[in-house]
Every structure is written in C-alpha cells, then in structure tokens.
Curated annotation (Swiss-Prot):
It comes from the Eukaryota. Keywords: Chaperone, Cytoplasm, Nucleus. Has a stimulatory effect on the ATPase activity of HSP70 in a dose-dependent and time-dependent manner and hence acts as a co-chaperone of HSP70. Plays an indispensable role in the organization of KRT8/KRT18 filaments. Acts as an endogenous molecular chaperone for neuronal proteins including huntingtin. Suppresses aggregation and toxicity of polyglutamine-containing, aggregation-prone proteins. Also reduces cellular toxicity and caspase-3 activity. GO terms for biological process: chaperone-mediated protein folding. The keyword Nucleus applies. This is DnaJ homolog subfamily B member 6-A. It is found in: Cytoplasm, Perinuclear region; Nucleus. The lineage of its organism: Eukaryota, Metazoa, Chordata, Craniata, Vertebrata. Its main location: cytoplasm. It holds the Pfam family DnaJ. One of its GO terms (cellular component) is perinuclear region of cytoplasm.
Amino acid sequence: MVEYYEVLGVQRNASADDIKKAYRRLALKWHPDKNPDNKDEAERRFKEVAEAYEVLSDSKKRDIYDKYGKEGLTNRGGGSHFDEAPFQFGFTFRSPDDVFRDFFGGRDPFSFDLFADDPFDDFFGRSRHRANRSRPAGGGGGPFLSTFGGFPAFGPSFSPFDSGFSSSFGSFGGHGGHGGFTSFSSSSFGGSEMGNFRSVSTSTKVVNGRRVTTKRIVENGQERVEVEEDGQLKSLTVNGKEQLLRLDNK
C-alpha cells in the first residue's frame, strides 16, 4: 500500500511548506512529459505524488489519513470506526494533471524550468538554492532544454531587481512530444530601491494546433497570471487565487 509521507519523502510531522516543496520537486521530476523514455513508471509515480499532496496538503484529509489510512478517505475499510469519518461516501481523487495545473496557478512551469528554477521565486521569499540542482538524466524536453540544463536563473550575477533586463528564447520541438513551437520572453523594469519594480514574463507554445500563451506579471509584490488560448483569455489568477472571468464581449 502506498504510504503518502514516503511518497513525498517527508516526515509525518512535516509542515505544510515542506509538503508543498516536496510536491513541486517530485511533480516536475516525474511529469510524464519529462520522462518520454520511462512513461509507465513516470505516470504511476506522478499519480502517487499527486494523491499524496492532495491528502497531506489538506489538514482535514491529513487528519483522517493519519488516523485511518487511505481507507478512511475512500471508505473501503468496512469497519464501524470508519462510519465517523467525514467522507461518508468516499473521497474521490482528482486527476493528477488537474492537481498539477492548480498547483502552478495555470502557468507553464516548464517554461521557467529552462533555467532550472523560476527566476521570480525570490519575490515571494522562496530560496533559489534549487537553481544549482543538476537536471536528471533523460529528463526530456528537447535539445533546447538540454542546452540550458543546470544553468542558474539568468546567470549567477543576475539580480531580479536589475533595471531594464529583458530576454527571449525560442525552440522547436516542445515538451515531451507535444510538438509545436515554444517561446519564452521576460523583461523587468525599475529596481528595489525605487519601490516600483515590474516584471513581465511570457511563454507561448502550440498544443494540438492551438496557441497557448501564459503571461505572468509581477508588480509591487503582486503576481498576476493570464492564460490565453488562440487569443481568448481562459484563466486569470491573482496571487495564486483564480478570478472569475467576465464574458462580456469587448
């Protein structure tokens, strides 16, 4: 039986932040698109990691799991002690792809993984130590990703508060056999002393004939992520919270 704490590689007393960091690392490592030569195992591990995160990141589900195990969530234990569990009709796990998509707020994490880390992580107090991790062998993602594998975020001397920084990259091949053109661009203006820092990053790729563009805007501590499909806004998140979209015609 799968043990969720072991799946994420955390202790039973792990904090919510530890669980989130573990999921981020393992979901990126085992995403099937990153493991085209080991897809069966990757899909299994990716699903296990998603299940573990979905349970352990929710205090209520985690408490039930700690007391009754997975059977307490799926209501398959058969014993009377499960009758008191809040999930009387069994908890249904979401698709691992949905968990992955929700976790990253609609943006494409592989666009930022070109540099082995998200260059904007430091805005929200997260450590950049992951930038120096070596990329796993056979990680997929095409020759462009291999070219930049292990490359620190914009170079060791780059500061996210440098004034007027901009860059753009592009490649053919896509991620894990999706095909199509993938591009990434980033620009930043202002500085930490000016108090009006603004950064805009955009990634565009063609998936199944549709052009998907993800724009991330970070300004004065606020993060806004817009996802467009063929020019139509499909999702909008502000500081990780999904916003309702108005359907008014412009």
